[in-house]
Amino acid sequence: MGQRFYEIEQGPWWKPSTWSKKIWVLVIAALAAIIAIVVAVAVVVTRNNAAANAYPSYTQLNYTLKDTYSGTSFFDNFDYFNNYDPASGFVHYVPAATAESLNLTYASSSSAVLRVDTSVGPSSSPDASTGRFSVRVSSKKQYNNGLFLFEVKHTPYGCGTWPALWLVDPNNDIWPAHGEIDIMEAVNLADTGNMMTLHTTGDCTMESVKRLMTGTAEQGDCHNTTNDNAGCGVDSGASTYGTTYNSDGGGTMAVEWRNAGIRMWQFSSDNIPADITAGNPDPSTWGTALADFPDTKCDIGTHFTNASIIVNIDLCGTLGEAKYPSSSCPKNCVGDYTCVGGNSPTNCTDYVANNPDDFKDAYWEFGSFKIYQTS
């Protein structure tokens, strides 16, 4: 009875000619909503596809040498950091005079060395119960772009170490407002090789972005609040840092930082491009980069400014401490190493405090740093 009434008053639903004005309005509104959704999805897909296929031109630039850090005056170009470690390391960063007296930094005509102290142990006075002596330096000059050539002869490694060569604003209070570019970084025995990473504020990502590089992309979001501040990193393989890299004679890390993107190459000491040797570096001839961070979804010029060159060897800290339990470093107080004070057998700080001889390989050795910029 009810169905017949509906058909008499409204007509069957499958006959639009019998629909009332109210039904027509509802149908048109529904169709409009569906069309809007389809269009929005198409726009998003188109944008994502465009981003996935977009790539900066990286047109050839003419670079001129602006700064050279080398020889016995190498460390004259740097300020020594002598404050509490922002990365919560088990370390005492010493001033220049102390670094010199402890032989933690020194330079000759051919190389410059920055290392961790190996003299202080559990029976020393003072001991290393609150942290081991080390060094962190930052260049007196800041940069906003350029082509950086770092001749690295030896990379530091060892249980409890967290060394890095990086670019960042020396004002720690505003980090990461001006970005961070990690060029060489590893922890503990560095058996996974070098990690190259960007850290930024929001709106900078490498996810779903075309990249031309030989390294392996890790996390894609560069924002410091995501992935426990892992940043957007590129893994480059075991031979790019640590024992293999050092035994092969080291090499040169090249970093091109420009608005189009940030690219990094690593050249072994016996395979340096001729244009670098000749003093006329041309990244357009170097082939595929080891790491590539294009500007597709990251405004490089806005996110990265006012950066000093930083060299340091942290100990434990937020990253080294976190990675220590899963490393192949000693874990047991009995047998593997001496524990003092009954600390946890997986405690990175206990190992660092009580095993000074194990830091003999924890040193950077550089030939020179050369910074080129466009004329």
Residue ranges and their predicted role:
Residues 16-35, 41-189, 269-270, 277-289, ...:
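Low-complexity, Ser/Thr/Pro/Gly-rich disordered linker/stalk regions
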Residues 1-23:
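Intrinsically disordered, low-complexity terminal tails of fungal membrane proteins
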Residues 240-243, 250-253, 297-299, 355-357:
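Generic recognition of flexible, low-complexity loop/linker segments
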Residues 142, 157, 173, 236-237, ...:
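Short, glycine/acidic-rich beta->alpha junctions
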Residues 154, 185, 200-202, 256, ...:
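Short, structured patches in soluble enzyme cores that scaffold and shape functional sites
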Residues 176-245, 314-321, 334, 343-350:
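Glycine-aromatic-enriched beta-strand/loop faces of beta-sandwich-type recognition domains
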Residues 293:
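Conserved His + Asp/Glu catalytic blocks
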Residues 247-263, 267-270:
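Localized edge beta-strand/strand-to-loop motifs within extracellular or lumenal beta-rich domains
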